[in-house]
């Protein structure tokens, strides 16, 4: 049987519904109850609208406790904050003013027992979408998907089970157990942690924060049915306990396109290609150095073959060898007078045609000639002396 208790309350259809609140209304459903002023319930079973202007549409065991809170479908959800809302999902609690939860939560049978997965949107205008065991504590923070996401920072975002610290304002954690503990930090990938402001992290160091455990104290209250129950005390700050990583871990960026602009990332393939080119250039440079050194040795081996006072044209060949490289040089020397000499030398072959040239002139008075006859003169003198000796002996 339906019961109308509140002034101006209305019930339309349904069964076992109770309209306690003044000007409250129930339309259809079963075992629903309106307790707040101007509250309303449409369909569903076992729903309660305890907050002023609170409303529930369908679902089961949902509670619109906050002023202006709205719940649509789902099971066992609660809108505690003013103007908070929960749509779908199970066991979710929108606590902060204007907080919103869309789906997620739930109850899971692990094989031996049932485990309740509850999302809590405690920050003002915080949002949780399609996740489980999430806690959005920071005002304006958002948690999307995954499991166990925690956002302590203002206007921070967790995607796929990441976390943000209390100082991580406007930060983003993308990936399971990824996190940011600093302002404007971005963590990309599993267990990546941003620890320097404005940076992007792809891994973590030993000792970095690996997550946060958020626990609310309990308090005893009397519910709308007059029963005393223990519930989380959302009026007090929760106890936040950080955990840390024991070992460092660094993720790889895979399947990247080659960088084009000056500030693009470089792939391993590009590095290998650049290193190969550098090694090739080094090899060519070494070959060039070897050839140049051998050529200099060959040019240094060119010498004129003029006797003292001789004039004319002379040719010379020089050889040089250095680190497996051999060079040949050809030289020409021209002495038009006893005091002037021109010389020209060039390296031939192997495409490394080095050359040199020179001009020399003798200046100042000539030094006195030292008695240093040539071999022919000495032979002639000895022959003459021998003949003179024979004549004297006759």
What is the meaning of each model-derived region?
Residues 322, 349-351, 362-364:
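Structural signature of outer-membrane beta-barrel domains
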Residues 338-344, 364-370:
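Repeated loop/turn-to-beta-strand initiation elements of outer-membrane beta-barrel proteins
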């Amino acid at each position: 049987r339906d019961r109308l208790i509140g002034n101006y309350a209305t019930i339309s259809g349904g069964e076992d519904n109770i309209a306690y609140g003044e000007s409250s209304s129930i339309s259809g459903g079963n075992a629903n109850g309106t307790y707040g002023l101007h509250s309303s319930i449409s369909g569903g079973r076992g729903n309660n609208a305890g907050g002023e202007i609170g409303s529930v549409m369908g679902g089961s065991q949902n509670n619109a406790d906050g002023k202006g809170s709205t719940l649509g479908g789902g099971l066992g959800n609660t809108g505690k904050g003013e103007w908070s809302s929960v749509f779908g999902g199970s066991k979710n609690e929108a606590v902060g003013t204007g907080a919103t939860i869309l789906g997620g939560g739930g109850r899971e049978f692990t094989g031996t027992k049932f485990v309740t997965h509850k999302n809590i949107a405690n920050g003002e205008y915080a949002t949780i979408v399609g996740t489980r065991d999430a806690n959005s504590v920071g005002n304006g923070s958002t948690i999307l998907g995954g499991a166990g996401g925690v956002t302590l920072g203002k206007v921070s975002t967790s995607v796929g089970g990441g976390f943000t610290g209390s100082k991580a304002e406007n930060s983003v954690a993308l990936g399971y157990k990824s996190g940011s503990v600093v302002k404007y930090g971005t963590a990309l990938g599993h267990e990546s942690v941003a620890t320097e402001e404005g940076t992007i992290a792809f891994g973590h160091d030993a000792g970095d924060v690996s997550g946060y455990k958020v626990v609310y104290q309990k308090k005893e209250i009397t519910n709308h049915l007059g029963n005393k129950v223990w519930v989380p005390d959302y009026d007090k700050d929760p106890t936040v306990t950080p955990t840390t990583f024991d070992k460092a871990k660094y993720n790889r960026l895979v399947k990247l396109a080659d960088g084009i602009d000056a500030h693009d990332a470089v792939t391993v393939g590009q590095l290998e290609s650049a290193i190969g080119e550098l090694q090739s250039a080094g090899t060519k440079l070494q070959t060039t150095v070897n050839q140049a050194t051998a050529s200099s040795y060959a040019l240094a081996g060119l010498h004129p073959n003029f006797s003292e006072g001789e004039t004319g044209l002379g040719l010379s060949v020089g050889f040089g060898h250095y680190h497996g490289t051999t060079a040949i040089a050809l030289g020409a020397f021209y002495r038009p007078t006893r005091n002037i000499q021109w010389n020209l030398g060039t390296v031939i072959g192997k495409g490394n045609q080095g050359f040199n040239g020179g001009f020399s002139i003798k200046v100042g008075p000539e030094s006195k000639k030292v008695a240093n006859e040539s071999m022919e003169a000495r032979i002639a003198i000895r022959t003459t002396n021998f003949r003179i000796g024979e004549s004297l002996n006759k």
